[in-house]
Each structure stands twice: as C-alpha cells, then as structure tokens.
Amino acid sequence: MRNIIYFILSLLFSVTSYALETINIEHGRADPTPIAVNKFYADNSAADVLGHDMVKVISNDLKLSGLFRPISAASFIEEKTGIEYKPLFAAWRQINASLLVNGEVKKLESGKFQISFILWDTLLEKQLVGEILEVPKNLWRRAAHKIADKIYEKITGDAGYFDTKIVYVSESSSLPKIKRIALMDYDGANNKYLTNGKSLVLTPRFARSADKIFYVSYATKRRVLVYEKDLKTGKESVVGDFPGISFAPRFSPDGRKAVMSIAKNGSTHIYEIDLATKRLHKLTDGFGINTSPSYSPDGTKIVYNSDRNGVPQLYIMNSDGSDVQRISFGGGSYAAPSWSPRGDYIAFTKITKGDGGKTFNIGIMKACPQDNKNSERIITSGYLVESPCWSPNGRVIMFAKGWPSSSKAPGKNKIFAIDLTGHNEREIMTPADASDPEWSGVLN
C-alpha cells in the first residue's frame, strides 16, 4: 500500500519481552493462541461501520492462519474500547485471552480514515506492537490485512501473508466450459474477472511485482500466445507467440528473464527468455519431456521435472543449464515443482498408483540435493490435488483440489490452502470452480 497506506507511527511504546513464546510453525501442530479482537472505538457512525468490518477481517485472518483462536465478543467483560486507556488485564485473563487487540477509527477532514491499533500481552500486561495508519475508505480491507500481518509477525517471527492477492483460472460449471483468468484477495474476497472467456486460458503467473500477470491463451488450436496484463491500467499485450508452450512462464527474481517449457520435434525442453530482447536460450537437451521450471529465490537455480530416466522426477540445475542433479527418489511420478520464497523447501505434485487406482499428493522436500533423499513429506492427498504455490513467507501452500463426477453430483475443482506442517487445510471460497492458483507477494 506504499503511497496509499503509510505508517505514521511504527511503535507507540517500547517492549523488549513478553510472556508468550514465539510460535514455531514448522514444529508440528500447536494449540491456537486465544486472542480477543476488541471492538474498535469510533468517533462517528461511518467510522463505526468501518471499525466493525475491520474487526471481522482481522479476526478471520488470524483464525484462517490456524495459529490463533479469536474469542467471541459475547464473552468480553470489559466494555471500554480504544487505545487511549490501559486495559483491565484481569478481565481479559478471566476469559482466557492471552492476547488483546484494541483499536480506534477516526474520520479525517480529508475524507480518509485514521486507524490505530495496539496488541497487548495480557499475562505480562505489556504492549507488543502498535501502529497508526491513514487510508482512503476503499482500502479499509487492506488496512485490516496489514494489522493482521503485524500481529502474525510479532507472534510467529515470520512476515504475514494476509495483504496478498491470488490469480487463478475460474471455470463455469455449465457446458460448454468457460475459463477466465480471475483475481481475488488471498481469502477469496474482492473476486473479479480479468478475461472475457472467449478463448482458452491457462496458468496465470504474477510478474516480480503483483502489478502484472502473465498467462497462456489459445488463440487457435495451433496458435498459443503468452499475454502480459497490467492490473493497474488493464492494458494487455502479447509477450510472444510460442507454438508448443503449455504453461505460462515463471519469472526470475530480478524480473529480467523467465523460464518456460516448449515442445519441438517430439521433445519438450526448458527455455529461458530475455524479456528485453525476447531472445530464447535452450537450457535442457536430449530426448524426453522437461517441464514446469521454477527459479530459486536468488535466481541461481532452476527446479523442473523430467522423464529422461523413464518416470517423471524432479531435477535442479544452475540457471544457465549446467550441473543437473536429480532431487526426487521416491516411487511415483513427480510434477509441478515450486520453490519456496524462503529457499528451504520445494513443493510438488506426486502421482502414485495403488489397488484403488491413482492418488494425487502434494508434498514438500528440502531444496538441497545433499539433504533431500529422506526429506520428502506428503502433506495432503486426494482424487486430484495439483498446482502447489507458496505464500510469500513460505509457510502456507495453496493448491487446486478436484472431485470426480458421480450420479449425485458433477465433478468440481476448488482452491485450498494448507500449512507447511500438513495441518489446517481449508477451502478458499470462489464464485465458481477454480484451478491453477498463483500467490502474489505482499502488496506495496
């Protein structure tokens, strides 16, 4: 929200310690921390409505993370609201609230709103973090996400991921199927369509910033175009006409290059394109199918899947195509690798066969080839689970999940999220069927 939402005050009071232990979200499942998000004080009716809505969004963000348990306002004892008083901590401890959020909303002469909040530790009776934001009314939801991000970061030690966007493919349930690129907040709010559904579209990807996306469009069965769309202006342009491409490019961390797979002469290989010159550089060779490339966060490595040894497995190579190393060694076929923004893990889809037929799995493994022979961990499975992508803090994975048709109901596809630990799986609500999610970085 840079240039739109800015922080006037970074810290209202200095705090050096607090009673709550920092939540480590890699160490299995822990009981959610009980938190009370109190009613925000408001100086007029418009501010009161805004404050009420913000409390709901903040509470929902924290609840969806699986790390916090918002306490019902019906059990609150203390009636005071706002940030200008010290809470009656005993009253909050009585309802088992370890954390307390107080806030206030004021309407300014400019028409904007000043939003303040304080996070309290009720056990030590200390403030943990507090800030003041100034926002136009239409960005109140982003302000709420920003506050939830600050709370999440203070308690977990990791950056929050609530002020983010998801781009995905929306698919109508009626025949003929209509696929459109859609954009929404990370929690499913503010859904809007970016394409008109007149052509087949696939695999939307964010550019280095969240201001632009790229996607594949089938103008005809033989003509496949990669489009760039500016989300601020709505303008769209063709990046290139790439016969044989099946997935949109993934972009290097510096935004200067992108990698993609292109099928030619019976083989599919990884190519890197210089976005300034549009020149292609082939990175893989030999026979076989090499697809789904993804850069490491520092841009020096690329992970991809290849069937060069008969069964699709995952490989890592330098960004110039050298030093190829296999990193997957389990049974089954591997696909769709995605490198964590933190650089520590790679998420993937894995297809295994059993007596009941095929099972799709989403898993993670360590990104270091020397460490990953025994590091693979499956975090969810189903009839169809695919297309994993990471939250910007590398601690949540979003993916597409499908169900088959039956005599009672048609098949469907939805978007889900799950924690790195394999817990807290939840659906991200969309107006229609959805697939191919891609998570933006935290918005400016």
Curated annotation (Swiss-Prot):
Spans through the membrane: none
Family according to the record: Belongs to the TolB family.
Gene Ontology, cellular component aspect: periplasmic space
Primary location group: periplasm
Signal peptide per UniProt: 1-19
Coiled-coil ranges per UniProt: none
Keywords: Cell cycle, Cell division, Periplasm, Signal
GO biological process: cell division; protein import
Protein name listed in UniProt: Tol-Pal system protein TolB
Complex and partners: The Tol-Pal system is composed of five core proteins: the inner membrane proteins TolA, TolQ and TolR, the periplasmic protein TolB and the outer membrane protein Pal. They form a network linking the inner and outer membranes and the peptidoglycan layer.
InterPro entries cross-referenced by the UniProt entry: 6-blade_b-propeller_TolB-like, PD40, Tol-Pal_TolB, TolB_N
Function: Part of the Tol-Pal system, which plays a role in outer membrane invagination during cell division and is important for maintaining outer membrane integrity.
Subcellular location: Periplasm
